[in-house]
Amino acid sequence: MSDSTAALRRKIAGAGDLHAVVRTMKALAASSIGDYERSVLALADYDRMVSLGLGECFRQARANPTAAPERVTAGASDPISAIVFGSDQGLVGPFNDVIAEHAIDVLPTLPGRAQVWAVGERVQARLKDAGLDVLGAYAVPGSVEAIAPLVAQIQIDTEARRAQDGPRQMRQVHVFHNRPQAASLYEPAGQRLLPLDATWQQSLAAVAWPGKVRPEVLDHGATTLGALIREYLFISLFRACAESLASENASRLAFSLASDSAQA
């Protein structure tokens, strides 16, 4: 057998292995999309309870302004924590480029120094190539069960960084991710999580407590408010991660279907 024939057979075998990998990833993507979408829906009740608690704290703060926390205005030198969700694996088309470019476009327009935490090797590389300060990187969770530990670690790391800030600094927190969108599979989204939006606070405070007996908020609401804000951040990051994973798998499935059509 000539060397060229042997090389050709190796290439054919390699192509067969690649097709098998693509088929496997296609099947996994199809089964995972529903899991991630259902996990977002499952957050709704908990999100509602946290929102009701926040609304009660905001109402008390309005009734007792001296107990409300001091507001600090963000300055040009204040840091920004940006969490960007991408992917570790390929075969997702422009998925990582889309969200990386969105973050790269938005962050320079914000008043502050951006410090980035990237979820996914591929989006991390894209952000570093753009010159952004990537302080941390995380592996993309492979299941719904792995999302909560990831979010908890992100909260620990970003909170540790916030603790290093000066007492007069206000660290903003932004999250960037792709979210499902019917017409084009997904679209890039960005949200400021901290500081809390004043209009949003007013809207929560305007929602009446559902029971006849209103809860008592202890410690002028400071301790309770801090705990509820941490839960609000957890919910927001969990939702962003789950939506990103649903979008990633939808993109991978579309890529696989396009590949199958091209081979037909």
Language model features: what each stretch is:
Residues 1-264:
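C-terminal beta-strand-loop-alpha-helix "lid" module of Rossmann-like NAD(P)-dependent dehydrogenases
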